[in-house]
Swiss-Prot record:
It comes from Homo sapiens. This is Opiorphin prepropeptide. The gene is OPRPN. It holds the Pfam family PROL5-SMR. The lineage of its organism: Eukaryota, Metazoa, Chordata, Craniata, Vertebrata. Residues 150-198 are annotated as: Disordered. Residues 1-21 form the signal peptide.
Amino acid sequence: MKLTFFLGLLALISCFTPSESQRFSRRPYLPGQLPPPPLYRPRWVPPSPPPPYDSRLNSPLSLPFVPGRVPPSSFSRFSQAVILSQLFPLESIRQPRLFPGYPNLHFPLRPYYVGPIRILKPPFPPIPFFLAIYLPISNPEPQINITTADTTITTNPPTTATATTSTSTKPTMTISSSTVPISSTPEPATSISAATPAASTENTTQILANRPHTVLLNATVQVTTSNQTILSSPAFKSFWQKLFAIFG
């Protein structure tokens, strides 16, 4: 298998590679390099002598050689068998005539026998089937009588009463304040104060005391971290004012 593959591959490569004569042109030989080709002369070949013994055991004596002479064959037990039919001429095989007038016939013969035409009978009666397919059956179309009558259309506009109720709710705001007890150790406490700006001022933000611990937000609610709890509300301010007024 491998040898066949390699031989086929070499044959395929040799088809696409140029031969030695196609690679480069050979230079002409000089006159003294090669001898001239010999002239053609017919040679006389002496006839070979006959074999000393033939394939037969009792071979006849060899006759003097004469060109074109074939020695006669002798019958022996080892010679080729003789067919008796070849000794007598063969006679032509006689064939009986078909009928009188052969080969000039009054009518030509057909190449094959054509029997009578057989008509297959259908399994059902052919008349209704033929009528159902080939004869058109008329289907009467139904007649439609259209009658028109006077019609009156009255339209009343609908009247609906809808009751509208409006409810108004006022927003209520609840403020819850818680007090953080102050312990002996200072702990950070948070206080949430809600302040409403006055009507005369335009700035809505309010900064509480203790600026280093103040966280400023954009909203009005601010978260402050300090050691002491300070609740800035109107109720506590009025309480301290009353206390200072009493003990002042």
